[in-house]
Amino acid sequence: MIKIGVIADDFTGATDIASFLVENGLPTVQINGVPTGKMPEAIDALVISLKTRSCPVVEATQQSLAALSWLQQQGCKQIYFKYCSTFDSTAKGNIGPVTDALMDALDTPFTVFSPALPVNGRTVYQGYLFVMNQLLAESGMRHHPVNPMTDSYLPRLVEAQSTGRCGVVSAHVFEQGVDAVRQELARLQQEGYRYAVLDALTEHHLEIQGEALRDAPLVTGGSGLAIGLARQWAQENGNQARKAGRPLAGRGVVLSGSCSQMTNRQVAHYRQIAPAREVDVARCLSIETLAAYAHELAEWVLGQESVLAPLVFATASTDALAAIQQQYGAQKASQAVETLFSQLAARLAAEGVTRFIVAGGETSGVVTQSLGIKGFHIGPTISPACRG
């Protein structure tokens, strides 16, 4: 029986939480899209990777409820709605509506929001979300091309996109221990709150969250809460996650569609030591030019003889991204680049490329779909510093 069933709103977020579950003792499988077959054997956690972060609300809720239905059929004990540690959901976003839909389907009157991931500098204090030492709305996330985050106070963000009141369980309460946290959660629920944002400044706070929420039918958050919950579930039988999911040998390629500040720094470094080619957005905008352009890029990748995998990137700085969006339109440009990466990945796979390193949630989603990958056994984390 699955102990934790995760419904993740994008591919990289799904992989991220799966790695935390494995790291903390739960054998885990990640599946792309709503499963239709039987449950994989010998696992304690299953992560369903959807592509619902930025799609229409109706589509996001329908897919999430379909994932929930499948997990319920497998006898899953706890449902975990996973979103980004930077929240990535405005007043018109999907986190609130999906959470409400899951709550209604599970007939639960109360749940929590815990996006904190201290190991990556995402902390929550008095309900305010910080990225490193900056408030969310003062970080690079304020320039996000799809979900610009201009408010840092999570209860206000939650209430703007959902159907109830949202309180806060402060770091001061967490310092008093798990019993104090349980009492505060009970108090908020008794006073008519539908949600609670959980402060977290340290991994110890996440461990307390996991202990306090061990029996909750539904939790929501980033990857951090999974640390505490996995340690609680793993204590039952001492299961150690198997070291599966090792990379294949063979030719590789790096595809980068993320425009985050961290990815910009990573791309700037990598292109100094490996072959790199920047995507020309203008050539992605029509079907005729896009197909020829994907073929051209595939030929370029296959022609490289460097020991390091060649890089094809659409990663752009804040100013460059703004110029692209102004010239072509944000939605049109984003979809065109995604289609390019999808076609490019398929062409490269057909030519024998077996290793794909992909940066960006949307990019990862379209690449895995184009490769026809249905699921993964999640192995050990190879580079904690690369988590997003």
UniProtKB/Swiss-Prot annotation:
Entry keywords, A to Z: ATP-binding, Carbohydrate metabolism, Kinase, Nucleotide-binding, Transferase
Cross-referenced Pfam families: NBD_C, SBD_N
EC code(s) of this entry: 2.7.1.217
Positions that bind ATP: S258, G360, G361, E362, T363
InterPro entries tied to this protein: 4-carb_acid_sugar_kinase_N (IPR010737), 4-carb_acid_sugar_kinase_N_sf (IPR037051), NBD_C (IPR031475), NBD_C_sf (IPR042213), OtnK (IPR050007)
GO molecular function terms noted in the UniProt entry: ATP binding; kinase activity
Database matches in Gene3D superfamilies: Four-carbon acid sugar kinase, nucleotide binding domain, Putative sugar-binding, N-terminal domain
Catalysed conversion reaction: 3-dehydro-L-erythronate + ATP = 3-dehydro-4-O-phospho-L-erythronate + ADP + H(+); 3-dehydro-D-erythronate + ATP = 3-dehydro-4-O-phospho-D-erythronate + ADP + H(+)
Homology family: Belongs to the four-carbon acid sugar kinase family.
Function as written in the Swiss-Prot or TrEMBL entry: Catalyzes the ATP-dependent phosphorylation of 3-oxo-tetronate to 3-oxo-tetronate 4-phosphate.
The protein's name in its UniProt record: 3-oxo-tetronate kinase
Organism, as annotated: Escherichia coli (strain K12)
Encoding gene (name): otnK
